[in-house]
């Protein structure tokens, strides 16, 4: 019985120390609407580190890592080779339920925030983010310099869908911070999870989460909803429109 009480007390004390700092955050816009002429935008994440009496007196400097993840989906990266003057697909790798959008921001270089072991465990930096692949009949994440993984990240980065910036987080005061979240024109639709992790003297202190949503509006959304919810009606209307277009074209261009 005494051991159980001591264990419970230890858990309580650990929980109390873990709550020595509390993160309070918010996003400038929790619902982003995408119209046909949407060209991208930048959201602003801002927040503060709230201390309490149990915060160590010598803890005055903090580090922050912000991770933004879009809706997850299966994706494929293909290897092309030139044979007989023609580029053909020779191999491919499937990535399973990986973020369609992924951004990591910090207030200083990731390798100066914490140790490599903690960085791997907390997935700090693109090289440490888990990207599960189908390798033959197995599922695994591979080494960061794997050719398919490197190509996948490079292609997503070129489209503005994957990024990391070790200077994007700014501390306005020792405890008040902000960062921008750039969204490209082709940003995927869905719910985006934002995870904010707090470090001090290389140690992981705690984290908090928030989210925002990207939705289509207007005629595009109406068409998408109709196709998803009433597939038969959508197919019939599409076929009718195609027939009408062909009929009108035959009238306009027919020879008298």
What are these regions (language model features)?
Residues 7-15:
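Bacterial N-terminal signal peptides
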Residues 16-20:
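Sec/Tat signal peptide C-region and signal peptidase I cleavage site
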Residues 21-36:
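N-terminal edge beta-strand
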Residues 49-53:
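Short solvent-exposed capping/turn motifs at the termini of beta-strands
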Residues 82-184, 188:
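Membrane-proximal low-complexity regions enriched in glycine and acidic/polar residues
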Residues 182, 205-235:
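Short, aromatic-rich amphipathic segments at membrane interfaces
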Residues 186-216:
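Extended, hydrophilic extramembrane loops/domains of integral membrane proteins
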Residues 232-256:
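Juxtamembrane interface at the cytosolic side of transmembrane helices
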């Amino acid at each position: 019985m005494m051991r159980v009480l001591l264990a419970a007390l230890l858990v309580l004390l650990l929980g109390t120390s873990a709550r020595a700092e509390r993160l309070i955050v918010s996003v400038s816009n929790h619902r982003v609407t995408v119209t046909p002429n949407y060209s991208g935008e930048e959201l602003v994440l801002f927040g503060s580190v709230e201390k309490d009496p149990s915060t160590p007196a010598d803890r005055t400097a903090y580090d922050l890592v912000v991770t933004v993840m879009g809706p997850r989906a299966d994706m494929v990266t293909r290897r092309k080779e030139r044979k007989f003057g023609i580029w053909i697909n020779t191999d491919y790798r499937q990535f399973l339920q990986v973020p369609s959008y992924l951004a990591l921001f910090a207030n200083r270089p990731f390798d100066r925030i914490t140790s490599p072991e903690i960085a791997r465990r907390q997935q700090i930096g693109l090289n440490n983010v888990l990207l599960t692949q189908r390798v033959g009949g197995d599922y695994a994440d591979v080494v960061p310099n794997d050719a398919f993984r490197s190509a996948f990240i490079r292609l997503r980065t070129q489209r503005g869908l994957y990024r990391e910036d070790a200077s994007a987080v700014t501390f306005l005061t020792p405890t008040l911070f902000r960062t921008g979240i750039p969204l490209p024109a082709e940003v995927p639709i869905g719910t985006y999870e934002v995870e904010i992790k707090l470090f001090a003297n290389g140690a992981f202190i705690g984290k908090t989460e928030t989210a925002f949503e990207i939705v289509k509006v207007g005629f595009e959304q109406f068409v998408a909803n109709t196709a998803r919810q009433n597939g038969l009606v959508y197919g019939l209307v599409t076929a009718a429109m195609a027939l009408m277009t062909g009929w009108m074209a035959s009238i306009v261009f027919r020879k008298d």
